């Protein structure tokens, strides 16, 4: 049930990204303060939805939910908790969710700390971030679903790639993504 909640949260985030891409941009074009003002709440709501999805994937790893293909391919019940959690972003699907969560976090940060920006500029920035989010979310939902189920579930997973079982994996991708993905705000 939790993986389905995570998948639903991704779909909800995609719908919010569509709205974030259109309404603020349209408001900036028309000079409509109400539509431009929708950018911040949409950005925060999208961040919350993606965070719920990421948390659902972490939950699947921590609880060894072997009905999720991603968990079977990248986790094992005998792994230490650190490598179960870092295994979430040690694969293609999980790293994409981390990517969009960081991007949505940057969008939410613009919403929270960009009050001094002109409203038309903030609306346009949020619209562009919404478009980027939508592209990545569509890719995840349609081609790289991390919540895909398998039945019957195997007794245990294959485990994380041994090359990725390093403390550096715990900190390297999140820090790299904060810097790498954060530059999307400047565009």
Model feature map: region roles:
Residues 1-187:
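Polytopic transmembrane helical bundles with strong interfacial aromatic enrichment
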